[in-house]
Structures are given as structure tokens and as C-alpha cells.
Amino acid sequence: MRTFSRLFLIFILFSAVPVANAAAKPGGRLIVIRVANFGWNLVANLKIDGQTVANIVQGRRYDHRIPAGRHVLTVSVVPNNQSSQPTSITVNVRPGGTYIFTAQWDSDQVYLRPTTLSPAEMAKLGL
């Protein structure tokens, strides 16, 4: 019985190693800031590669790590009373990189604008 227990323990330990390596896969940081004049009763719906990851409400932002590689970011407005079409932008995430976008309006359409912030501006936003 002890031999079985030891073998089982060794099996579990070796099985856990690939999971830990997969979880530690390097990626980048994606931040999407919702502009203040977006509309108090509107939500910016953010999708990454076709999957909804956030509904960004007034005063909030999306700030998460995403895997390295090419990703399609799509933003739309909810509720969509004006029948505006979602817009997309492609980002090539590199390990350790930070990618900041602003969700904002242009006419009747919401879009993501790449943002370049200075270190002082990033510190002010707590980034």
C-alpha cells in the first residue's frame, strides 16, 4: 500500500508541472479606459477574439493580462439604440508589453483609440 501511495504522489507531482508551466506563459497587459463623456447610461462592451470579456461602465476600466500573440479587440455600445456597428482593432501582444486603448465616440460610432501615456500620466491613473 505504501508503494502505491508513493507512486501516486510522484504521478501527481509530475502531472502538476505542465499545468504550472502553462499558467506561467508570458503575456501582456491590456487596459481599456472608458472616456468620461461616453454617456452615463451606456456601456462599452469589449470582446477579445469574439468573446465578451467586459462591459465597461462609467468610471471603470478593463485591466487584465492576456496571452501573447495577435488578438482582435472589438467594442460596441450597450444598449445600442442607434444601431451602430461594432468596430475592431488588431493588437499584437508581446510578452511584458502594456497596451492601452480608450473607448470613445466618433459621430454615431464607438471605437478603440490606441493611447500613448507618459510615465507621469500612467502613475496618475494608477497604471
Please give the residue ranges for each predicted region.
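Bacterial N-terminal signal peptides
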Residues: 7-16
